[in-house]
Amino acid sequence: IEYPDKSTNTDKYLSVKYSVPEELAGYFLKKFGDNETEEMFEAFNKDKSTYIRCNTKKTDIAGLTAALEAEGVMVTNEGIDKRIDYALKISGYDYLGGLKSFRDGLFFVQDISSMLASQGGFIKRDAYVIDVCAAPGGKSINAALMADIGHVSSRDISGRKVSLIKENAERLGIDNITYKVWDAVKKDEESVEKADVLICDLPCSGLGIIGRKPDIKYNVTYEKIKELALLQRKILSTVWEYVKKDGILIYSTCTVTPEENAENTEWLVNNYPFELIGKPEQIMPQDGTGDGFYIARLKRTE
């Protein structure tokens, strides 16, 4: 392949080399510069690892490792963030559903970046957690395992999505989740000031997970990014009231755009009674092992 000249036509060069639409390449260049954009595009083309979360209700990491190895699966904790002690990286299997350990509910698949959203000790054992856009359910399940004597209210916009969460939780034998079909832009009066922790993992452009779902890059335009950022604000402006005073709001996305991430967090702090806890985490696809992901943790102040 003959590539366009990189120095005079960088967006076209990156577009051809990494099979990314030119408009999207131009957007990334404007936001992240030449080097970081190319590193990101390279990361999208690398093989993605499969990470799993141990179902601590049924087993521990040692027990899960032994069960998987007995089925011929290769298991390691290499490259897993030190804050997470219940995850493994697996390879060398044909089909997850064919594994007895999977069918027995000893684990569920969740990317390492996504697991980090619940970290930090904010979900106490007796917490009441609301997860507003919960499908396929990884964060709800993670929260239910942490709040093992507490409760999780897991919601999404359609019956199909909610049944997916339920199916996953039932396979794992998790019984402290209730399910609700609910559109997050509509206020649920019954939930006002009820949540110790509110999980807002909102619909986004998904640009952090292009490595897993390459089709995403053909569907995202700058207009779409702006539309999604507005939808996220619409949801946040509705659901923030569910958080109790001194409760925690976790805002996360699987994207890397400032419009959907840092700018929305700043908007939330400027318009509602919340303060940031620590610095938000923007995980880039090229940072290491997990997907591109954003996490901000905020505390309700009044």
Predicted regions mapped to residue ranges:
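S-adenosylmethionine
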Residues: I1-E302
